[in-house]
Every structure is written in C-alpha cells, then in structure tokens.
Amino acid sequence: MNEELQNQFMALDVYNQQVQKLQEELSNIDMMIMELLKSIESMEGLKTSKEILLPLGAGAFVNAQVQNPEKIVLSVGVDVLLEKDVDEVIVDFQKSVEELEQTKELVNTQIQKTNQEIVKLRSELEKRAAAIEQRSAQMKPRTN
C-alpha cells in the first residue's frame, strides 16, 4: 500500500474520531441545557410554593421550606458564593441556554462538514480499491 493511501486511511480514522468527540460534546451540551431548564423550572416553582425536595445524597430527599425564595445563592468558584435575585438568576440561566443552543448549532455544523469529508474520502478510497482490483485482475495470467 502506498504512502498516500495510508495517509488517506489515517485521515479517515481521524475524521471518525473527531465526529465521535463532537457527538460527546453535543451530549454534554444537552445535559447542561437540561440542568439549566430544570433549575429555571424549580426557581419558577418557588414563586408559587415554598416547599421543595432537598437532596441529601444517594437518592435520599427531605421535604423543606424555603425561607427566602426571592434570593438564590450561586456557586461562582471554589468556596465563593454569590446571592442574587431569583428573577435575575432565571434571566442569566435563560441566556446560558440560548448560548448553549448556539454552540450546539456550531457543533452540529462541524459534524456535518466532517461527515461530508468522510463521505468524500471513502468515495476516493473505494475508487482506488476498485482500480487496484482491476489492475490485479489484468495482471493475473489467464488459464484456458
């Protein structure tokens, strides 16, 4: 197998790995969006009910009353907490969802472009394989 053909097979492998990583990134983006939307829903729920289920860990929860539902405490770094109005946090989270949706579109576009390159490269490799087979068949001595 010549060097150019080897390079094309390696490129095909790299493209496939890129698509896999981009799909993993899409999955992570989807999880972040779902988490943000769930948080927004929970904060909206605080406007009508002060009762929440508080996670204790390992699948255990306790019913709790929120004393100050107008304020949300956010973790903004290691051991750094910030208190903000609930409506402000909801707006911030909605903006984050919008930004993630835009990022998701960019990742999808990159996946499509990479898949197009994969299709193009596979087509070239199939043509080369057919040409090699044809040459190989022509070189074989014919037996009668």
Curated annotation (Swiss-Prot):
Keywords: Chaperone, Cytoplasm. Its main location: cytoplasm. It is found in: Cytoplasm. Disulfide bonds: none annotated. GO terms for biological process: protein folding. The keyword Chaperone applies. Molecular chaperone capable of stabilizing a range of proteins. Seems to fulfill an ATP-independent, HSP70-like function in archaeal de novo protein folding. This is Prefoldin subunit alpha. The gene is pfdA.
